[in-house]
Amino acid sequence: WAKEERDEGIRTVNMLGCHDGIPLLDLKGLLPMERIQALIDLVVSRGGLVKSLHGQKNLYYQVNATYYSALGEDDRKMLLARALQLFMPGKPQVWYLDLFAGRNDREAVARGGEAGHKEINRTNLTGRDIAAGLERPIVRDQLRLMRMRNACGAFEGGTLTVEQAAPDRLILPWERDGSRARLEADLSTYAFRAVTSEGGEESVFEQ
């Protein structure tokens, strides 16, 4: 998909979670139906909800969950997902509750009535919640990766090379006018190394 975006000049906005659900219709053609169903079942087993298309059975169009809960509330998975989002082609967009590693809000769902399924990922954060969240490593680390991306000119019209030496290994190097960025990710262990170089100064993040 990253190669297709690059080669076809496809312009995208990249999101993990958003104010609505995590869309499923866009997965058709990218993943087999069996894999899509397995993803649905996994998210539901972790407390998420699934919405059918206009009430039709077995024709699902979104799952409702925070991205953090969909990943099993695993900090390493969340941070790798954020790194991949930031290094993929397109403009990254970050939903506030994902940044703060928010959990499924089933109480809000119960209060929301018929359309309450969307409230699972719309928890209101107080100033105290935000202050406490900014002390969490998962929040600070996401912010650090975002700052690395924002400060590096390689992502603005730069050249991307997609390297995949093995099914679970992905390398995404960017380069533009001396600015460089590189992500090396192991999808099986969730380990990754992100490096950006701008004006002779290098920033490195590893997990």
Report residues per predicted region:
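Active-site and adjacent substrate-binding regions of carbohydrate-active enzymes
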Residues: 1-207
